[in-house]
Amino acid sequence: MVQKKSQSSKTVTVEQIGSPIRNSQIQRATLKGLGLNKMHRRRVLEDTLCVRGMIAKVQHLVRVIDES
């Protein structure tokens, strides 16, 4: 069954501020999973526990810009 997204779903804006060079493959894959692949790129993501966990794993490489 397909679930529809509600209009009031929370989002979080994330910006990549660090380079994945000299970081582990897991951290590179986490950045790719967040949709970030180049410096200073921003993504608006749904605010879920999974996304928050991914942000926590690469907290030295990303910055949370906006939580709405």
UniProtKB/Swiss-Prot annotation:
Keywords: Ribonucleoprotein, Ribosomal protein. InterPro entries: Ribo_uL30_ferredoxin-like_sf, Ribosomal_uL30_bac-type, Ribosomal_uL30_ferredoxin-like. One of its GO terms (molecular function) is structural constituent of ribosome. Disulfide bonds: none annotated. Coiled coil: none annotated. SUPFAM superfamilies: Ribosomal protein L30p/L7e (SSF55129). GO terms for cellular component: cytosolic large ribosomal subunit. GO terms for biological process: translation. It holds the Pfam family Ribosomal_L30. Part of the 50S ribosomal subunit. Belongs to the universal ribosomal protein uL30 family. This is Large ribosomal subunit protein uL30.
